Design a protein with these regions (language model features):
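Acidic/histidine-rich
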Residues: 153-187, 459, 464-490, 527, ...
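Glycine-rich phosphate-binding loops that contact phosphosugars or nucleotide phosphates
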Residues: 292-441, 521-565, 585, 593
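Conserved short alpha-helical segments that host acidic/polar catalytic motifs at enzyme active sites
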Residues: 1-250, 262-295, 334, 429, ...
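Glycine-rich oxoanion-binding loops at beta->alpha junctions
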Residues: 67, 71-84, 275-288, 312-348, ...
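Hydrophobic alpha-helical scaffolding
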Residues: 7-10, 100, 120, 135-139, ...
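Generic C-terminus detector
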Residues: 253, 544, 557-559, 569-610
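Active-site phosphate/pyrophosphate-binding segments
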Residues: 260-264, 268-298, 388-517, 590-610
């Protein structure tokens, strides 16, 4: 993984591929490369470790001319980041070039088989096996060779391939990894993600698992593995191409933090009736009997989406009174879970392509569970695999660290909890009306937080040099603390941990010492007294406490060194507000430390391998 592009047409392929790869930089990567079928049908490969600019310099110094090519940005899974491990990979005879997202799980026995035949490998990757297999199995027909090669490999993949003997054709296929074909006039495009091609075309085919695509300048043919034609509707992309630009902000992350009021408004749009008395989820169309038949809810996700799931557990159990279990997706499928037909499995994924989450979804469905996907990407794997889907209308999120996707996930999940409660009759009508009214005000309330950004920036500048930080909270605040901790560590590289306030005495207090920053969330009235005791405990050890509470909380201000107040609202809506200053605090701490905010080290935006 991470990003794939391909071009065939009348332009110089290298120009498009460098442009497209730049649009995929948000995924995170450690190297980049291109392969172009040029003069005399020779495949010329150029690849370089590091930023895309390194590859661009190589291409500028040694132009790569031709009208058909494939490109890739890599995030290492097999083999260290290096020039030789970068994609594309070629066969020894130079006939084939391949780019690949995913993992070839049986690459080692295949490699041993090829080594025994005298094939020489030049990289440590699993992908190179595919190039050599194509060469070893070549029967003079590119397409039939690809189909037979696919019978040999196991795992997850998006594969895009060219053959020097058939220089007017690109062949691509996928399994459990995203792939899209863009349609032009006298030219066509291939990419792992729509942003790579949106400036060239809005007419696309979203490729499904086990489909094989044959692309020429004037045609796109889609078949199944056996070669039978597949009929597919054209998907028209409605995104604004400018949505992927920074819009005057220094970083995508800051831009996306400030886009949250609009993203929240868009996610709420049409989902609350005029009187704020009902949630309207037309895309679900569930019945009271169906919801009453749900005995248990399983939420599974990874990273930030997992933290959204933890908040949702409180939402659903309190408002709909249905038991909820939250699982890390990578753990769920390996523990023989107790999932059955009375279970509703909710999977959360910004991209809709997260490999572990997709695997968990498939396992839950295999065990008989009903399934619901919550994702930000129309046509994504989650949206296709789940029985039903709720979209968060956050728009493209470019920065690796998720911000607006998280807050819109919380909005969608709070609406879902209310929706479940109104269908099974377990939600209090007054509570429902209060929540829905406050949700309608949420975009404006989020804007208010930005009025205090200078104060947050000052805290970050003052404490950004610290190497450790702790986050505390109780109930929903604990789940938000976990997200705040993740944001701080992933972009500023400050070691940060989140703890439930009641766990302090069970070990954490041993780590509290003079001058260590503690961010204490105190928005939940039901545990106020306990949380104040926890704050006093860390203050007694000379910690520097930044309290996060709602406006007018004079008691909190007495016990902490600094306060960050968010607008006053109800206990269910406030987590969506409380996370915003934590995002800003993390952002400015990273700036203070000179970190690469949009592309933190060792991380990828969309994790499409297990």
């Amino acid at each position: 993984m991470c990003g794939i592009v391909g071009y065939i047409g009348f332009e110089n392929a290298a120009d498009f591929m460098l442009e497209g790869l730049e649009k995929l930089e948000y995924h995170g990567y450690d190297s980049a490369g291109i392969a172009v079928v040029g003069e005399n049908n020779v495949i010329k490969v150029q690849k370089k470790m590091g930023r895309l600019a390194n590859l661009e310099a190589v291409v500028k110094a040694d132009p790569n001319q031709g009208h058909i090519g494939i490109g890739h940005t890599r995030w290492a899974t097999h083999g260290r980041p290096s020039d030789m491990n970068a994609h594309p990979h070629t066969s020894t005879d130079g006939k084939f070039a391949v780019v690949h997202n995913g993992i070839i799980e049986n690459y080692m026995p295949l490699k041993e088989e090829l080594l025994a035949k005298g094939v020489e490998f030049t990289s440590e990757t699993d992908t190179e096996v595919v190039a050599h297999l194509l060469s070893d199995m070549y029967d003079g027909n590119f397409e039939s060779t690809v189909r037979r090669m696919l019978e040999r490999i196991e795992g997850s993949y998006s594969l895009v391939m060219v053959c020097a003997d058939e220089p007017n054709k690109i062949i691509a296929t996928k399994k459990d990894n995203p792939l899209v074909v863009g349609l032009g006039k006298g030219e066509n495009f291939i990419a792992s993600d729509i942003p790579a091609i949106i400036q060239r075309t809005r007419e696309t085919y979203i490729i499904n698992d086990n489909e094989v695509v044959i692309v020429t300048p004037d045609s796109v043919t889609i078949t199944d593995r056996a070669g039978q034609p597949v009929q597919k509707d054209i998907y028209h992309v409605t995104w604004n191409a400018e949505a992927a630009e920074k819009g005057g902000y220094e970083h995508f992350m800051l831009k996306e933090i400030y886009e949250q009021p609009k993203a929240i408004r868009d996610t709420l749009s049409g989902r609350i009736n005029k009187d704020a008395t009902e949630v309207v989820y037309d895309e679900l169309n569930w019945t009271p009997d169906m919801v009453k038949g749900i005995k248990r809810i399983l939420i599974t996700a990874c990273g930030t989406a997992y933290h959204a799931g933890l908040v949702a557990k409180y939402y659903i159990e309190q408002l709909a009174r249905i038991p909820v279990e939250v699982d890390i997706a990578s753990e769920y499928r390996y523990r023989t879970p107790l999932t059955d037909e009375d279970t509703l499995c909710i999977v959360i994924s910004q991209s809709g392509e997260t490999s572990d989450t997709l695997s968990a979804l498939k396992e839950a469905k295999r065990l008989g569970a009903k399934s619901l996907g919550i994702t930000n990407v129309v046509g994504s794997a989650v949206s296709r695999e789940a029985d039903q889907v709720i979209y968060t209308w956050a728009g493209p999120e470019i920065a690796v660290a998720s911000t607006k996707a998280y807050t819109t996930q919380l909005v969608a999940l709070l609406l879902l909890a209310v929706y479940l409660g109104q269908l099974n009759g377990r939600i209090d009508e007054a509570v429902k009306h209060e929540i829905l009214t406050n949700l309608q005000e949420l975009p404006a309330l989020t804007h208010e937080i930005f009025e205090n950004v200078d104060e947050i920036k000052a805290f970050a500048n003052h404490y950004g040099y610290k190497e450790d930080a702790f986050f505390l909270g109780r109930l929903i605040d604990y789940a938000v603390a976990m997200e705040g901790s993740l944001k701080l560590k992933e972009i500023s590289y400050i070691h940060a941990e989140a703890y439930a306030g009641g766990e302090l005495k069970h070990g954490t207090l041993a780590l509290i010492e003079e001058g260590i920053p503690v961010i204490a969330l105190a928005t939940q009235e039901s545990v106020r007294e306990k949380m104040m005791s926890n704050i006093k405990e860390v203050k007694a050890r000379d910690a520097i406490v930044i309290g996060v509470g709602m406006k007018g909380d004079e008691e909190l201000a007495k016990y902490v060194d600094h306060t960050i107040f968010v607008p006053k609202t109800d206990a269910f809506t406030v987590p969506i507000l409380a996370v915003v200053p934590l995002q800003l605090l993390s952002y400015y701490a990273a700036i203070t430390r000179g970190a690469d905010v949009d592309k933190p080290r060792n991380l990828a935006k969309s994790v499409t391998v297990e």
